[in-house]
Amino acid sequence: VSGITITDPLVTVSGTIASLAPGAIDITSFSAIYTITQADVDAGSVTNQATASGTDPSGNPVTDTSDDPTTVTPDDSTVTPFTPNATIALEKTSTFNDTNANGFADAGETITYGFKVTNTGSVTVTGITITDPLVTVSGSIATLAPGGVDTTTFSAVYTITQADVDAGSVTNQATASGTDPS
């Protein structure tokens, strides 16, 4: 077979084989590099199949599609899986609202909570919400890409009770949750 080239829907393959004898194998003549996209990472894999084309000695076209050597199915696409890493980090801040300006917390005054959500993983996280046992947290993040930070979506206000004043502080912890693409 002569004039062998490879076409691939994801990449431009460089190289050519001028001629390949029956039974011969050439694994060094072609190369291609594919850059993984965020959509690939979110999907959990890249699926791809290339086609080799050439001409037999009679001038007839000869083609074959690539095969994933890890399966028994002939001429199937090669799947490169990724391990998803869906992680988010939550930071919670508080601001005491001293409405009577006496410098002390009084029952009926409020604490405003701010929340910072960071996607520290490798996949896009969707439907992010925050729960807090002390307050109702308003807001929801539809999607947050890897490395993304949101500091404006969520907020909550807590009204200080006399028990809080007597205790000298208010302590609680919030939890952020979301859904990975899989």
PLM regions: where:
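Exported/extracytosolic protein signature
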Residues: 1-182
